Amino acid sequence: MRCLGLMSGTSADGVDAVLADFRGSPNHPQWDLIRHVHHPYPEALRHRVVSAGQGEPSRADQWLDLAEAITEAQAMAARSCDPHAEAVLVGCHGQTIWHRPPTSQQRGASWQLLQAPLLAQLLERPVVHDFRAADLALGGQGAPLVPKADAALLGGTKGWRALLNLGGIANLTLIPPCCGPDRDASVQGWDCGPANSLIDLAVQQFSNGTLLFDRGGAMAKAGHSDETSIRRWLQEPYFQSPPPKSTGRELFGRANLQQRLNDLGRDCSSQDAVATLTSFSAAVVAQDLEQLMQRDRIRPLELIVAGGGRHNPVLMDQLQQRCRGLQLSSSQEMGLPVEAREALVFALLAWWHQRKHPGNSPSITGATRESVLGVLVHPG
């Protein structure tokens, strides 16, 4: 069955689209990646999405306009990826505006901006959307949803495999081996903390908006990181909390960046600040892997990296230095382009919805039970 997956993440740089074919068992599907594209958001739309994700107030009509613009961008990405309308089903995550994990005092909630009926009408195909809602209703975090799909798509190794996505947020998946004493262990996964979110915001601020990200790690390469600040930041509650946990720009956005820049002090150059934030993103992942070893005695054989951060050589070098003894590789080496992984996941989640197969993992999200994810809408 050919499905189209659409994903726009916390980096808010555009829409990743994947056309894939799935067949066989839902637990261990056979799959082929047919085509993938990246459709950039126009600068004005990107700015509106980032501002909305910082909690900046807008009028009701502005929210409607933004939802429509996001939906039209998703449709353009879909048409570009699937020009001959081969897909019979579309899985669309939408654009996360706000994510609130549950607490002991408050139910969890998550808002992905999208007009799904409009998207179904524009593409003339059924659309599965609102993937987080069912897990949240069952007391879960609603995220991350990628790990269970990762295990289905990329499992089958003799040792623990770690997959790291470096988007706006860094998230880890730990896939158990297919044999040996850990073969019946559960998939693990969580959001580590910021990957590109703080780096991108800092570069945009220091360049007065002329740069959107640290291309080639140039600014970080020209600076020196403040290891004292990094060690202090790693003691913050989120980084010391065990999974399940999920986060986004609500926690690691402009306000958080400003706090860290204030902490670094006025004498810190822009290059040193970006170098520190880049090293911090790597240190967050390294600390999580070390805590995993101490907590569960799990040490993965390899760390497979995907997402836009894979193209930042300074970030990758910092990961290699801080994750000693761990072999780093790219998802590209497994036939999965680094920008395509999450869009492929939402194509799979749409297929799972059609097959009535649960898409969440309670051991990851904290939900009370498994559930089929997503809401299906048909074109009128």
Curated annotation (Swiss-Prot):
GO biological process terms, semicolon-separated: 1,6-anhydro-N-acetyl-beta-muramic acid catabolic process; amino sugar metabolic process; peptidoglycan turnover
Record-linked SUPFAM superfamilies: Actin-like ATPase domain
An example molecular function term from Gene Ontology annotations: phosphotransferase activity, alcohol group as acceptor
Pathway: Amino-sugar metabolism; 1,6-anhydro-N-acetylmuramate degradation; Cell wall biogenesis; peptidoglycan recycling
Reactions performed catalytically: 1,6-anhydro-N-acetyl-beta-muramate + ATP + H2O = N-acetyl-D-muramate 6-phosphate + ADP + H(+)
Record carries keyword Iron: no
Annotated positions binding ATP: 9-16
Membrane spanning stretches: none
Keywords for the protein's UniProt record, in alphabetical order: ATP-binding, Carbohydrate metabolism, Kinase, Nucleotide-binding, Transferase
Pfam families linked to this entry: AnmK
Enzyme class: transferase
InterPro entries, per database record: Anhydro_N_Ac-Mur_kinase (IPR005338), ATPase_NBD (IPR043129)
Listed EC numbers: 2.7.1.170
Job description of the protein: Catalyzes the specific phosphorylation of 1,6-anhydro-N-acetylmuramic acid (anhMurNAc) with the simultaneous cleavage of the 1,6-anhydro ring, generating MurNAc-6-P. Is required for the utilization of anhMurNAc either imported from the medium or derived from its own cell wall murein, and thus plays a role in cell wall recycling.
NCBIfam families linked to this entry: PRK09585.2-5
UniProt record similarity statement: Belongs to the anhydro-N-acetylmuramic acid kinase family.
UniProt-recorded name of the protein: Anhydro-N-acetylmuramic acid kinase
Species of the source: Synechococcus sp. (strain CC9902)
